[in-house]
Every structure is written in structure tokens, then in C-alpha cells.
């Protein structure tokens, strides 16, 4: 989506010398063409990371933009502020998923910040035009401590649940 460039530009406007680590592929190719047009931004393209190293990669960053549901889950577990770039699905089902995720993630936030969080997802996922993106990013960065605390709280909650594999084994053993 071309919206990623606009979002990165706005994030770079809020962060001094922002470093964006991008995994090789079409988005990295597009951003390499834009890198001289985005002030305060440095881009580092890296090869695909093995799954067992992906959590470490996510955890090494202050904020992440992830693609897909598996990456979303991993980003939630490492406790970093995130934006989810969902894969399109039939019948627009991804809009319902984005909306439900944003409602869950921002529960208890002030209404304007909830709306900004939803809107950045709608913009990135092509459900909303990019007008107002500067305002949306500004609201999110003005409330970055809330965003960080929320990310850490969700990570703690998920980590307390334990390993899905072990929970399945425990469940199965209880049935015996």
C-alpha cells in the first residue's frame, strides 16, 4: 500500500533520526526509492529473519508495523507499540478484524486517541484516505506513553497465559 510511505514520513517527523528496519521485499524496494524524500529517516533493509529470531527483531525496536496475523501475535507478545497492516481477505472481513482489534487494544483510552489508533489502521489498510494522517500520528505520539503502557500490559497478559502448545498438552491430559 502506498500509505506506508505517508505513515513513515509522519512518524519520522516526530522522531529525531528515526531508524526504520525493513525486511527485504516490495515495501523495502519502494522505500529505498523514497528514502531521500523523507527527512529524519534512516532505512536499513535486512533479509527475512528465521521465525525463531523474529521476536528478538521485534523486541529490538521501539515501535513496529507488522504484516499479517502471526506477526501481529508476535508483536503483541513482545510488548511494543504497533500498527497492523493486515492482509486483505474476501468480502472485506479484514475490516471487521481491524475494527475488533483496535476496539480491544484501546479499551479504556480517551475517545480521541482510540479514534486515532483506529484511523491509522484504516488509512494503512486502504479503508480511509490519508487526509488527516498528520493529525492522527500527532495524537498517537502525544499519547505515546499510554501506547507503550498498553503494549506492555497486553504482553504481560498474554505471557501469563503460557505457551499455547503446553496449554494444549495440559488440556488434553485433563481429558484423559
Language model features: what each stretch is:
Residues 107-176:
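C-terminal amphipathic helix plus adjacent low-complexity
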Residues 16-22, 82-83, 118-122:
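Hydrophobic beta-strand segments of well-ordered beta-sheets in folded domains
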Residues 17-20, 42, 60-63:
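Short active-site oxyanion
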Amino acid at each position: 500500500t502506498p500509505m506506508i510511505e505517508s505513515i513513515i514520513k509522519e512518524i519520522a517527523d516526530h522522531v529525531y533520526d528515526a531508524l526504520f528496519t525493513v525486511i527485504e521485499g516490495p515495501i523495502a524496494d519502494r522505500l529505498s526509492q523514497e528514502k531521500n524524500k523523507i527527512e529524519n529517516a534512516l532505512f536499513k533493509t535486512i533479509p527475512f529473519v528465521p521465525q525463531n529470531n523474529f521476536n528478538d527483531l521485534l523486541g529490538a525496536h521501539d515501535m513496529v508495523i507488522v504484516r499479517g496475523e502471526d506477526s501481529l501475535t508476535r508483536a503483541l507478545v513482545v510488548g511494543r507499540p504497533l500498527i497492523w497492516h493486515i492482509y486483505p481477505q474476501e468480502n472485506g472481513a479484514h475490516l471487521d478484524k481491524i475494527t475488533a482489534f483496535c476496539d480491544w487494544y484501546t479499551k479504556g483510552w480517551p475517545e480521541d486517541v482510540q479514534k486515532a489508533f483506529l484511523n491509522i489502521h484504516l488509512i494503512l489498510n486502504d479503508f480511509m484516505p490519508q487526509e488527516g494522517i498528520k493529525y492522527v500520528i500527532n495524537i498517537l505520539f502525544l499519547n505515546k506513553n499510554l501506547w507503550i503502557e498498553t503494549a506492555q500490559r497486553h504482553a504481560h497478559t498474554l505471557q501469563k497465559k503460557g505457551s499455547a502448545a503446553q496449554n494444549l498438552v495440559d488440556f488434553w491430559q485433563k481429558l484423559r
